[in-house]
Amino acid sequence: MPSLKDLRNRIASVKATQKITKAMQMVAAAKLRRAQEAAEAARPYSQRMGAVLANIAQNVSGEDAPALMVGTGKDDVHLLVVCTAERGLCGGFNSQIARLARDHARKLLAEGKTVKIITVGKKGADILRREFSALLHDHVDLREVKQLAFVHADQIGHKIIKLFEEGAFDVCTLFYSEFKSVISQVPTAQQLIPASADNEAEMETAGDAIYEYEPDPAAILSTLIPRNISVQIFRALLENVAGEMGAKMSAMDNATRNAGDMINKLSITYNRQRQAQITKELIEIISGAEAL
């Protein structure tokens, strides 16, 4: 049975923790609004970019098609780009993305494929390193980045394209969490290379309009596809930030409520024990008085 002093110390400790989780919840809520606006603003641009590529790709085939669109013609080496958060305390947000990437990697390895992994975010790297340390090809550290910008995604995109041009992989897949709401973030896998031009939503958006291109479609694709890779990565990073803040807000809200429940239980235990101690002392005083 803990002493009254121990209970007082524990209540004070839980109250201090509750203040921290409440503050973190408020900070996450403030950041969530900006992150959600940024993610929602990036979606139409990235979707329209995909629609434009889908439309142009219909006019290009054979030897004219850029390598980034048609790939190497092989399916032997897969590059997985796994985007997670740099920090924790956001529930299962990071583990869900890592689990999707891990399951995909296991499936590819079971099929005899070669897998290479680039991690963006410390938490994903920590999780995947436990099982796939030999497969980790590179890590992108964004811990010092205060505000995500397109240049950060562009650097990752250039790194991926350089590896492709060096023949380091055949297929590249991007893993991130698509933000749906504060309580819903969906782990998502998106193929970057070869560029997927047969996506139904993109084809529908592209429509049946007939365009003339200057310069020729192949030249336009050679410029747009690298740009699209960076755009899709940037969107994924923005979706991740919004999802992380939503998950963190929910996690800290639950932690704050759990701390409140624990404080109530400890307070009840403290009051009962204190009451029992007072009763015991009164009995001792009365017994002593009767003895006199």
Swiss-Prot record:
One of its GO terms (cellular component) is plasma membrane. It comes from the Bacteria. The lineage of its organism: Bacteria, Pseudomonadati, Pseudomonadota, Alphaproteobacteria, Hyphomicrobiales. It is found in: Cell inner membrane. Produces ATP from ADP in the presence of a proton gradient across the membrane. The gamma chain is believed to be important in regulating ATPase activity and the flow of protons through the CF(0) complex. It comes from Brucella ovis (strain ATCC 25840 / 63/290 / NCTC 10512). Belongs to the ATPase gamma chain family. Keywords: ATP synthesis, Cell inner membrane, Cell membrane, CF(1), Hydrogen ion transport, Ion transport, Membrane, Transport. This is ATP synthase gamma chain.
